[in-house]
From Swiss-Prot:
Reaction catalysis annotation: guanosine(37) in tRNA + S-adenosyl-L-methionine = N(1)-methylguanosine(37) in tRNA + S-adenosyl-L-homocysteine + H(+)
Phylogenetic classification of the source organism: Bacteria, Bacillati, Bacillota, Bacilli, Bacillales
GO biological process, one term: tRNA N1-guanine methylation
InterPro entries from the UniProt entry: Alpha/beta_knot_MTases, tRNA_m1G_MeTrfase_C_sf, tRNA_m1G_MeTrfase_TrmD, tRNA_m1G_MTases_N, tRNA_MeTrfase_TRMD/TRM10
Protein name, per record: tRNA (guanine-N(1)-)-methyltransferase
Record organism: Bacillus subtilis (strain 168)
Cellular localisation: Cytoplasm
Any single GO CC term annotated in Swiss-Prot or TrEMBL for this entry: cytosol
Binding annotation for S-adenosyl-L-methionine: G113, I133, G134, D135, F136, V137, L138
Length: 243
C-alpha cells in the first residue's frame, strides 16, 4: 500500500511514521509513506495557500489551486487511482469497518488542511471520501490523518507479529475487548482472575467472551443493538440488568 499526506506541516509526521508499528510496516515493505508540503505547489511568488473567504467572515480558506495541482501531480504518477480522503468534522464518522474497507485499497491520499476550511471546489471535485474522527475541532487534519493511517496499516497482512491480534481488538468483532493481565499473578494484593490461571482453554475463552460482553454492555451498550447475540450472551445481559 502507498499512503500520501498533503500537508503544510510535514514535520508533524516524522515521529509518528518513524515509530512503532508504522515504522515496522515500512521495513516490511507493507506500506510506503510520502509526506508532501502542498505549499510547494503554490503558483504565486509568496507561496501563499490561503485567502479571505468570499462574502466575508472570520478565518482564512485554503485556495483550490495548490491542492488541485498537488493531487493531480501525485495521481499522475500513481500505479492505481488513489482514494482521496479529506479529513474534516463534516465527514463520515470513522469506524473499524471503514478502516477494514480502506485497508483493501492500493493507494490512499490524505488532504490535511488548516485555517477556517477548504474551498468547496476541493470537496466537490477532488475528494472520494470525507472522514471525521469525532464531533470536536482540531487545529488541522494532520492528527486525524495519522490516526486513520495507523488504524488502516495495522490491518495489512504481515504487519502485526500475531495475525490474530487485530481480530481480537476492540471493535473488530463489533464488541469491546476483554481485559488483559500479565505477571505477577498477585500484585500488591490485586490478583489475576483464577480462570486465567487455570490452564482450561475452554473456560478461559468463555471468561473472555463474557467479559467482552460485560464491558460492552456497561460502556458501549449501543454496540449491542446490531450485534448478533448467542443465547448464553443474552442470559448474561439479563442477569446484569437485574443487578
Amino acid at each position: 500500500m502507498k499512503i500520501d499526506f498533503l500537508t503544510l506541516f510535514p514535520e508533524m509526521f516524522e515521529g509518528v511514521l518513524g515509530s512503532s508499528i508504522l515504522q515496522k510496516a515500512q521495513e516490511k515493505d507493507a506500506v510506503q509513506f510520502q509526506v508532501v508540503n502542498f505549499r510547494e505547489y503554490s503558483d504565486n511568488k509568496h507561496n501563499t495557500v490561503d485567502d479571505y473567504p468570499y462574502g466575508g467572515g472570520a478565518g482564512m480558506v485554503l485556495k483550490p489551486q495548490p491542492v488541485f495541482d498537488a493531487v493531480e501531480d501525485l495521481t499522475s504518477k500513481a500505479a492505481a487511482a488513489p482514494r482521496i480522503i479529506l479529513v474534516c468534522p463534516q465527514g463520515e464518522r470513522f469506524t473499524q469497518k471503514k478502516a477494514e474497507q480502506l485497508a483493501k485499497e492500493e493507494h490512499l491520499l490524505f488532504i490535511c488542511g488548516h485555517y477556517e476550511g477548504y474551498d468547496e471546489r476541493i470537496r466537490e471535485h477532488l475528494v472520494t471520501d470525507e472522514i471525521s474522527i469525532g464531533d470536536f475541532v482540531l487545529t488541522g487534519g494532520e492528527l486525524p490523518a495519522m490516526m486513520i493511517a495507523d488504524s488502516v496499516v495495522r490491518l495489512l497482512p504481515g504487519v502485526l507479529g500475531k495475525e490474530a491480534s487485530h481480530i481480537e481488538d476492540s471493535f473488530s468483532t463489533g464488541l469491546l475487548e476483554h481485559p488483559h493481565y500479565t505477571r505477577p499473578a498477585d500484585y500488591k494484593g490485586l490478583k489475576v482472575p483464577e480462570t486465567l490461571l487455570s490452564g482450561n482453554h475452554a473456560k478461559i475463552e468463555e471468561w473472555r467472551n463474557k467479559e467482552s460482553i460485560r464491558r460492552t454492555y456497561l460502556r458501549r451498550p449501543d454496540l449491542l443493538k446490531d450485534h448478533p447475540l448467542t443465547e448464553q450472551q443474552r442470559k448474561w445481559i439479563s442477569e446484569w440488568e437485574k443487578e
